[in-house]
Design a protein with these regions (language model features):
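Cleavable N-terminal export/targeting peptides
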Residues: 1-23
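Short glycine/proline- and aromatic-enriched beta-strand/turn motifs that initiate or cap beta-hairpins
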Residues: 16-66
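Repeated loop/turn-to-beta-strand initiation elements of outer-membrane beta-barrel proteins
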Residues: 20-24, 50-56, 82-89, 114-122, ...
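Residues that define the transmembrane beta-barrel architecture of outer-membrane proteins
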Residues: 37-41, 68-74, 95, 100-106, ...
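Residue-level signature of outer-membrane beta-barrel architecture
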Residues: 45-49, 78-82, 93, 110-112, ...
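Surface-exposed, polar helix/loop patches in the mature regions of secreted/periplasmic/lumenal proteins
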Residues: 82-129
């Protein structure tokens, strides 16, 4: 994991020089099947070139800070924007106390300008593990509202619902700084 952190730091430095962005994310999740609550935090480092968005996401999840089992994940993400809608793909690695496996995901959605610095986002994601037996096949729908604080700073809130192998409702708070 230390190598991934060093790699991410190097990537962040390179992206910052290329005119990229960094996002900090906080998730509050509720598992509808078990009633368990969970928190997750993530950092995303990325770069936009025209209609393309390339990013690396690292996340850490736990039932509460300092208590409970920890899971970690890393994803390489590519997204293409077409006028108002977008399509994306992800390749990732998930590490839990009992498993370590690779996965993929496909995203699609619509970004809607709402005016006065606000933007809406409605979309969906399909995700699954490459190898069978990991119980990771999940579809997620989301709705989000973002606000541009400045030309370089934005905040967003997203509500999502997942179903399949994960039955979760989640709220995500996000801060993004563009360079």
């Amino acid at each position: 994991m230390k190598k991934f952190i060093v790699l991410a730091a190097l990537l962040a430095a390179g992206v910052a020089q290329a005119g990229g962005y960094t996002s900090l994310e906080y998730y509050d999740e509720h598992n509808r099947a078990t009633g368990a609550d969970n928190i997750k935090e993530a950092i995303v480092v990325g770069m936009k070139e025209g209609a393309m968005d390339y990013s690396l996401k690292m996340e850490n999840s736990q039932t509460e800070f300092g208590n409970g089992s920890i899971s970690q994940g890393m994803e390489i993400r590519v997204k293409r924007t077409f006028d108002m809608f977008y399509l994306g793909g992800r390749l990732g690695e998930k590490v839990t106390s009992s498993a370590n496996f690779s996965h993929y995901a496909v995203d699609a959605g619509v970004k809607i300008p709402l005016g006065a610095g606000f933007t809406g986002d409605v979309g969906a994601r399909y995700r699954n593990a490459f190898e069978t037996g990991h119980s990771y096949e999940t579809t997620r729908a989301h709705v989000a509202v973002g606000y541009a604080l400045t030309k370089q700073d934005s905040v967003a809130v997203r509500w999502s619902r997942s179903w399949g192998d994960e039955e979760k409702d989640a709220v995500r708070l996000q801060y993004t700084r563009s360079f």
